[in-house]
UniProtKB/Swiss-Prot annotation:
The basic functional RuBisCO is composed of a large chain homodimer in a 'head-to-tail' conformation. In form I RuBisCO this homodimer is arranged in a barrel-like tetramer with the small subunits forming a tetrameric 'cap' on each end of the 'barrel'. The keyword Repeat does not apply. It is found in: Plastid, Chloroplast. Pfam families: RbcS, RuBisCO_small. GO terms for cellular component: chloroplast. RuBisCO catalyzes two reactions: the carboxylation of D-ribulose 1,5-bisphosphate, the primary event in carbon dioxide fixation, as well as the oxidative fragmentation of the pentose substrate. Both reactions occur simultaneously and in competition at the same active site. Although the small subunit is not catalytic it is essential for maximal activity. The lineage of its organism: Eukaryota, Viridiplantae, Streptophyta, Embryophyta, Tracheophyta. Heterohexadecamer of 8 large and 8 small subunits. Residues 1-56 form a transit peptide. It comes from Solanum tuberosum. Keywords: Calvin cycle, Carbon dioxide fixation, Chloroplast, Photorespiration, Photosynthesis, Plastid, Transit peptide. GO terms for biological process: photorespiration; reductive pentose-phosphate cycle. This is Ribulose bisphosphate carboxylase small subunit, chloroplastic 3.
């Protein structure tokens, strides 16, 4: 019993060369008061609420004569250079490029079902076969040009298909007919 009782002063005063490099055991979290506070301590509730006086809010999509095609369809049409970069990104990720076209409705619409979350126009006609093994973005753009010649009044989109996960990873409009 006497050997298990020991004075903490005796342990602390004993100096040894090996103990000098030892790390002190974890003693818990330190008080938050020792850390510098960089945020403003304002408990006034009126300062939290704001109508965004200096912030310009984003407007909603105008519903009249503005058709929605894809997720980012509010952006301007892609130039040939931007289209080439998108296809290079698609190929760099190992996705299989595939072209689809739609001659009647290139936009979201409801005809067969009125429930929320459902819309027609999701499935387009495939242009030829998926381009398995394609490594050159200019080949994909050459197919887009060929599809434009065959169907000048059609919407054409490029999708990137991951054949390992069996999912579509990217989709964007490559061509819209005149007037859209």
């Amino acid at each position: 019993m006497a050997s298990s009782v020991m004075s903490s002063a005796a342990v602390a005063t004993r100096g040894n060369g090996a103990q000098a490099s030892m790390v002190a055991p974890f003693t818990g979290l330190k008080s938050a008061a020792s850390f510098p506070v960089s945020r403003k301590q304002n408990l006034d509730i009126t300062s939290i609420a704001s109508n965004g006086g200096r912030v310009r809010c984003m407007q909603v999509w105008p519903p009249i004569n503005m058709k929605k095609y894809e997720t980012l369809s509010y952006l301007p049409d892609l130039s040939d250079e931007q289209l080439l970069k998108e296809v290079e990104y698609l190929l760099k990720n190992g996705w299989v490029p595939c072209l689809e076209f739609e001659t009647e409705h290139g936009f979201v619409y409801r005809e067969n079902n009125k429930s929320p979350g459902y819309y027609d126009g999701r499935y387009w006609t495939m242009w030829k076969l998926p381009m398995f093994g394609c490594t050159d973005a200019t080949q994909v753009l050459a197919e887009v040009e060929e599809a434009k010649k065959a169907y000048p009044q059609a919407w054409i989109r490029i999708i990137g298909f991951d054949n390992v996960r069996q999912v579509q990873c990217i989709s964007f409009i490559a061509y819209k007919p005149e007037g859209y």
